[in-house]
Amino acid sequence: MTQLYIQDVTLRDGMHAIRHQISPTAVARIASALEAAGVNAIEVAHGDGLAGGSVNYGPGSNTDWEWIEAAADAVTTAKLTTLLLPGIGTVAELKRAYSLGVRSIRVAAHCTEADITAQHITMARELGMDVSGFLMLSHMASAETLAEQAKLMETFGAHCVYVTDSGGRLTMPMVRDRVRAYRDVLDSHTEIGIHAHENLSLSVANSVVAVEEGATRIDASLAGHGAGAGNCPLEAFVAVADLHGWGHSCDLFALQDAADDLVRPLHDRPVRVDRETLTLGYAGVYSSFLRHAEAAAQRYDVDVRSILIEAGRRRLVGGQEDMLVDIALSLST
């Protein structure tokens, strides 16, 4: 039987959906519910990872440390996880997260820049952490190129490497090709993960295809709480996993209750496929650009979709949020 590792991202990717505004009390409540529902791991951080709170990415209502401490106090069995983007988060932040109880780290880079993760992956392994490599915007590299980058992360020490569909742009054949390419080059003991977004309404389908091709770590969030149209909805994926007979440790009804009772009430903007979020996937734009693009569109009185299409044409990547204002200004003149 296929046995899955369910990695919740409600309290990290989900931060984008609420502009990184959530109290430690709410974090603890959600983390406790997730553990009770049986997820293997719970990721906690600013949406852009450790030290992501900034003018460019958006300040958080609290520090990463306050959120992590709240989650650490609330869980005992689920593995506390966080995300780090080299260039934003540093080895110092990694060590501090470890001191607060984080035992799993995902080290993220643009899909063609795995080389910048070596120091952080190596340090995490020295600390004894579970380490995953996170190749963002995986649609922007061919399956072969992506697999080469995944192999680099493996040589640095990653236990798992993800196909990370940050733009919600991958289709099912594209996911299949990328996971197969990973499996062809990675050692048999190295796990493969899938991080899907719902922008094209394919997050569950793409996650299923990934599992069929050998992925075992699945990123998902309560009510799909995440950037853009959201992540793979945890409760929906678990229901499908049950229908496929795949092994996991989750309680479907408990996930449904947590999604509807704890997470949906947090939304100040619906997390769904709509004209703006669909355009993210159609254009292949980083999902976390949504709220930044909407703000720029309102400021300069232009259609947010036009901004997103141009961002896709320019192949903008994470960290270039400021360019959305430049695009909006150009469109308004």
From Swiss-Prot:
Write out the residues that bind Mn(2+).
D13, H195, H197
Q: Where on the tree of life does the source sit, at the highest rank?
A: Bacteria
* This protein's record includes keyword Transmembrane: no
- Catalytic function, reaction form: (S)-4-hydroxy-2-oxopentanoate = acetaldehyde + pyruvate
What Gene Ontology molecular-function terms does this entry list? 2-isopropylmalate synthase activity; 4-hydroxy-2-oxovalerate aldolase activity; manganese ion binding
Species source reads Mycobacteroides abscessus (strain ATCC 19977 / DSM 44196 / CCUG 20993 / CIP 104536 / JCM 13569 / NCTC 13031 / TMC 1543 / L948)
Instruction: State the UniProt keywords alphabetically.
Output: Aromatic hydrocarbons catabolism, Lyase, Manganese, Metal-binding
Tell me the GO BP annotations in alphabetical order.
catabolic process; L-leucine biosynthetic process
> Under which EC number(s) is this enzyme classified?
4.1.3.39
Chain sites annotated for binding substrate:
R12, D13, S166, H195, Y286
Family, according to the entry, reads as follows: Belongs to the 4-hydroxy-2-oxovalerate aldolase family.
Does the keyword field hold Endoplasmic reticulum?
no
Q: PROSITE patterns per the record? A: PYR_CT
Active site at which residues?
Answer: H16 (proton acceptor)
Which major enzyme category is it?
lyase
Site described as Transition state stabilizer, located at: R12
Return the protein name: 4-hydroxy-2-oxovalerate aldolase 2
User: Which InterPro entries does the record cross-reference, listed alphabetically?
Assistant: 2-IPM_HCS-like, 4OH_2_O-val_aldolase, Aldolase_TIM, DmpG_comm, DRE_TIM_HOA, PYR_CT
**Which positions are tagged coiled coil?**
none
The Pyruvate carboxyltransferase domain is annotated at 4-256
